[in-house]
Amino acid sequence: MGQAATHDANNYTSINYTEIYDVIEDEKDVCAVADEPNIPCSFGISLAVPEWEAICTAIILTMIIISTVVGNILVILSVFTYKPLRIVQNFFIVSLAVADLTVAILVLPLNVAYSILGQWVFGIYVCKMWLTCDIMCCTSSILNLCAIALDRYWAITDPINYAQKRTLERVLFMIGIVWILSLVISSPPLLGWNDWPEVFEPDTPCRLTSQPGFVIFSSSGSFYIPLVIMTVVYFEIYLATKKRLRDRAKATKISTISSGRNKYETKESDPNDQDSVSSDANPNEHQGGTRLVAENEKKHRTRKLTPKKKPKRRYWSKDDKSHNKLIIPILSNENSVTDIGENLENRNTSSESNSKETHEDNMIEITEAAPVKIQKRPKQNQTNAVYQFIEEKQRISLTRERRAARTLGIIMGVFVVCWLPFFVIYLVIPFCVSCCLSNKFINFITWLGYVNSALNPLIYTIFNMDFRRAFKKLLFIKC
């Protein structure tokens, strides 16, 4: 009885160990499928893939590296050499191009060798620095996209105030924050937050740490938080642009109705005429605006678009050779005309001595981007031409805003397509022990993320006329 019991117990124990052993072996077999064998080639080195595949892979990846380097260098040179692009907000694009350029120079070449050879032959210290640069440069590229989205959001939703706040110091400060955050996110593995082996053999894989805490920390800071910010910001940009379209349509409708009720005219200058048209003595000075007089039977309607400074003005006389032209110096903020205030006042113009003071009060100031000359026409036609000109400039301004928002949306869409697969796998692997993916698949989603650094300059070239012209100029291509 006791012997039978012992036999049954031994049997039970034996069966249990056998089952556990079989499960372990099965898991090893499953993961072993993911490991690519080293294949000898005619060059005398071992490859992770067949020779023809290694050659094709090397050619394709080298082309990606070259296009990334050339494209981002062109972006940087364009901003510094092409005058229309030499504006403060484009320093964000320069920072993005620098991040993408460092990815192409410091990260991609070693990854090409690692992908083809199937083993890391550069030592443990190069491995650690390479992985750190990989995280830092890719994070910087993503955070720069986030900064560009925020900059565009503030420029569209609060153009007047943000135009004053958007100084070189502020932009450089934001860029500095981007790079500091990238360094903070990428450096913890160097300080001990890793699961790297202490002894690094030739066949030891050089991989990102799979420490769960760091994976959550780095993936959140590098991708998921910026993704949420960019999604919210882009949605707000869409709503703001849509609202401005509706407001612009309403304003156009109101101005059309009011133009039928009130009679606006521009008069030739006359020394004795109180309602003369004033302009800058020098048409190259863009700080002020021409003033038009609004006449009504009972009272003058005054509507001001105030500039920062009042330039020196002169009143034209009949002997002035230029009195047949209406010169409108234009000063624009964000390429649009903004109503700052509206005031209705009744003015008595009883004497000629105070006619200039009255003229200063009962005027409409119009500001825009460049000096424009309008030939003398009949009074009503002149007024219609001025308002048509303003409406056209407003329409062009809004078109530019929509185009910039669309470009930002395309950049964000490409960013999500390129990086989302990698960060999903990166976040899942530490928590899924039985998930064994092939090296080819890992290399594919990794390089899909790297391709984002090559696509950003192409997006600028396709959707931005100024960058397109700058690229042609740098490449000596006649427009």
Curated annotation (Swiss-Prot):
SUPFAM superfamilies: Family A G protein-coupled receptor-like
Chain intervals with Basic residues compositional bias: 299-315
Keyword GTP-binding: no
Biased composition (Polar residues): 274-287
Protein keywords: Cell membrane, G-protein coupled receptor, Glycoprotein, Membrane, Receptor, Transducer, Transmembrane, Transmembrane helix
Cytoplasmic face residues: 81-90, 151-170, 241-407, 463-479
Pfam families: 7tm_1
Gene3D superfamilies: Rhodopsin 7-helix transmembrane proteins (1.20.1070.10)
Entry protein name: Octopamine receptor
Originating organism: Bombyx mori
